[in-house]
């Protein structure tokens, strides 16, 4: 979850909360979300784990490798007409019922963000389950909205106001995706220096 600061709470810890503590936790989160930027969803920070040479599921390592492959980066450059992209960071996300991401624009010039992406991995989704990727216009209206579609990627320039609507309490499945930013960075500043680190490298 996040607002003024990002707080990572292990899923096991959340599930172990007694009912009264869980209620207070949700009330605090919802108070933050009511008037500002806040989010609540499950995530695995793929890029951080790769760069720190931490253990990572083979499937997630493969996804990171694909996103940073010449084939994918060339695809992004061709699609956008932008020659700058040279690195993609990523996290795996799971939105359960009640999870959300309030309006923000992904502005972070110091991180070299050029485009945001959502690689949707939910096999079946109904629009009325929520979890829509909403783009917000200058009047605060939803100008466009996209439901998760299996194996589809949403790619858009940042900064740009957007949000993920709250997943409905009757949603029939979690909303699964890999998300992140296409960036232009000095690859020599990555841990270990040189090109994007090999996610399959074994930790000593």
What are these model-derived regions, one by one?
Residues 1-154, 159-204:
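Fe(II)/2-oxoglutarate oxygenase catalytic core
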